[in-house]
Amino acid sequence: MVQAELRGDMPGVTTNAEFCERLRRRLLAQPEKTLLRVTVAPDFERPIEFTAKALLDRAEELASSFGITKERSVVLVLLPHSPELFLLQLGLVLKGHIPAILAWPTSRVDPEKYKCNLVHQLNHLPADLLITLPRLAENLAGSLPYPACGMSLANGASFEKIFPAAPVSERLGNRKSPKRNGCPNPDALFLQFSGGTTGAQKAVVVTAGMLAHQLKQLGEVLQLSDADVVVSWLPLYHDMGLIACYWLPLWHGAASVQIAANDWVINPELLLKYAARYKATFCWLPNFSFSYLSQRGEQMQKHSLGSVRAWINCSEPVRCKSVAEFATTFAGRGVKKESLQASYAMAETVFAITQSEPGRELASVPRSCVSHENRACGELAFDLIDDVYVSSGKPLPDTEIKIIAVDGSKCPDFAPGEIHVRTPSLFSGYWGAEGFQTHSLNGGWHATGDFGFIAEGELFVIGRFKDIVIVGGNNIFPEDVEAVVNSVAGIHAGRVVAFGVEDQEFGTQGLAVVAEMKGEFNEDAALQLETTIRKLVLTVIGTAARYVSVVPQRWIVKSTAGKISRRETRERFLRDRFSPG
């Protein structure tokens, strides 16, 4: 029965009830199989384990313990990595409620920025209940138009250990969060937040039909089965962690091993250790994670990684240097070039839009070939570090992609433009202060705001459309500049931002680069690095950088999802450089 459903022989899922019933049947087909392992500090040797039956029972039991009587309640969940967090996400869905997991702060997020983002969400997201740690719930009591319920965790996590400063409730002031008015959607399963870094993250309404379609199609492309194991350090408030690393294996009866993001940052070897111990077959990672592991590779060569069929880079764009270094560093531990895979994804389509072909090396296109006709894709050239654009794979079944030029015309192969997508898993709107707001689509097509091109049916993502820097009529992609600067010795790789600064005198933009220095900051060394960066950018990119600023570590602004915020970093740069005084 389960395998028939996976092959698509069973009718599709359209309602919440159908989804939950189908999920229960799938999981109870192997009730004693260990499906979920959650690591809890400090005892990393003994993850908390749940069999399929125990997972279902504990999840529903925990969700029921809050005594939520209102049907289809929107429940905000603000908890750190813990078994309870995974149980709540599943249990609230099974009980017919609509969970929304809010970002828990990591050790690398600026406390003030995090508090501002949290206050904005509490001020603008209609809900019926907030579940969080006891002290924080007490702190918020009276500041929200809905209850804040405290929940103690087995690992004794504390909000105050991370942010002992002013209470969040003081930031709310007298402004009440919007009252709950209606249901996001009759078949909404949960809300997930867009991973954008340009302003407040939006709550995407994910329905039963959207999720079921995504899980079925992605599972088929990856040839996922109940024999597979996913290992992850990605948080549940991010679509990669929530969909690819939790719901996808659950739906297909596969196991998953979940590591806290904070623990992984401190000890990246945990990911490889658990991949080897549990013979993981899939692992999703952003660009910086591949580099982060490669840079520490010499100390992590004792783990056998040959079981992993796919290390999937889910970034826009995929960086050749990131995957190449990872493949080279861990080749002796069983990592094959063909296991390096890629995907293009976003919360607005639940998750994946494209996926590279398993077992085949990533395709690439030399940068010089873009906009040229009759050029063929080749296998990823591992010796051409970032002289190529790397494929994010082909569209999932039933998913369409087209590239649109500025004038609205459809671009031919190899010609870059804005990426538009149409798929059955595409969202219909956001949930916010005004309730459910329908997202306008043009003939069912969603304009992603990303810039890229198609070659031989595969998608190549270049970057964000609005981030392009126009210098003297030439289009400069900031991601290209960042890739060049990341290679400079003394610069913290992955902590570089390029953007445009308006030049009213010349009627164009000037190229600006901000890069964090590796190690302790030194002004003389920073000046030398700035000179090196200017020369390298001019040589490789062919455009002079008007402004180059080498800064101390953690100067660059990141979102709560851990992504560099180009907009906020640019604003900080402009304030520091051009503000009077």
Predicted regions and their residues:
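AMP-binding/adenylate-forming catalytic core of the ANL superfamily
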Residues: 276, 283, 423, 428-429, ...
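Conserved AMP-binding A3 loop
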Residues: 46-55, 189-213
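Conserved AMP-binding/adenylate-forming
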Residues: 63-109, 233-236, 475
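Gly/Ser/Thr-rich phosphate-binding loop
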Residues: 280-284, 296-386, 400, 408
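Conserved ATP-binding/catalytic segment of the ANL
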Residues: 390-402, 406-414, 418-478
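Conserved pre-ATP/AMP-binding loop-to-beta segment of ANL
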Residues: 31-34, 170-200, 214, 220-229
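Conserved C-terminal "lid"/linker of ANL adenylate-forming enzymes
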Residues: 495-502, 512-513, 534-581
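Conserved AMP-binding/adenylation subdomain of ANL enzymes
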Residues: 212-229, 239-281, 296-300
